[in-house]
Amino acid sequence: MAIKHYKPITNGRRNMTGSDFAEITSTSPEKSLLAPLPRKAGRNNQGKLTVRHRGGGHKRQYRIIDFKRNKDGIPAKVATIEYDPNRSANIALLHYLDGEKRYIIAPKGLTVGTQVVNGPEADIKVGNCLPLQNIPVGTVIHNIELKPGKGGQLVRSAGASAQVLGKEGKYVLVRLKSGEVRMILSTCRATIGQVGNEQHELINIGKAGRSRWKGIRPTVRGSVMNPNDHPHGGGEGRTSIGRPSPMSPWGKPTLGKKTRKKKNRSNKLIVRGRKK
């Protein structure tokens, strides 16, 4: 999908870019695959703020996505490529031969009319989903399961991809976008190809209001707050942090501090860590 550049007719339009939506073939979603998406504004069930900088934005409906791809052996035809406001990637509507309809994440190169299949016997073709043990070494994949049958959890955002590096016993070595090489059970499933809409990271939002449309509220620096609001706050004019390292609003070390648990059970499955 190409990037569209706007003319600088206003200060907000200057340097603003957006998607041209050339791949989108339908603007009306499948009603049977929609679910309500109540506004949370970053609050939990007690009404307490748990995620900052959330609130407002355009009303949305959730598109029910098939991350499990467990309908084996029944061919499906791509009916439409659609925009999804809840994720960076586009989605594709599949019409199965038995009449069922499902949404999937649209990989790069998937077009309307293409036939896709799930299952161990599926061909190595963009959009097909099969167990990792049936995928050749060197294949580019996305939507990877971590537990068999749970559904894809890794490599789902726009332009993301991973690669099968090798096979060792009941595990398959997969190199992720971060450079991390990880062992994943060979019975876990993955989809062939790279996630589409790879130009998404090049979009320049251009103005603050466009973030508000997405439900993102302003981020205020801690150094301009009062001492009771943030560890960096207070002082006369611009002052240093006054602590050994930068702190989060709750007094925890941040900006470089490792947060992964040292006794994480999945540590033994990581062959090589991510790039620094």
From Swiss-Prot:
Keyword hit for Endoplasmic reticulum: no
Biological process terms in GO annotation: cytoplasmic translation
PROSITE patterns (alphabetical): RIBOSOMAL_L2
Region (Disordered): 36-55, 219-276
Source organism, top-level taxon: Bacteria
Function: One of the primary rRNA binding proteins. Required for association of the 30S and 50S subunits to form the 70S ribosome, for tRNA binding and peptide bond formation. It has been suggested to have peptidyltransferase activity; this is somewhat controversial. Makes several contacts with the 16S rRNA in the 70S ribosome.
UniProt protein name: Large ribosomal subunit protein uL2
Species the sequence originates in: Macrococcus caseolyticus (strain JCSC5402)
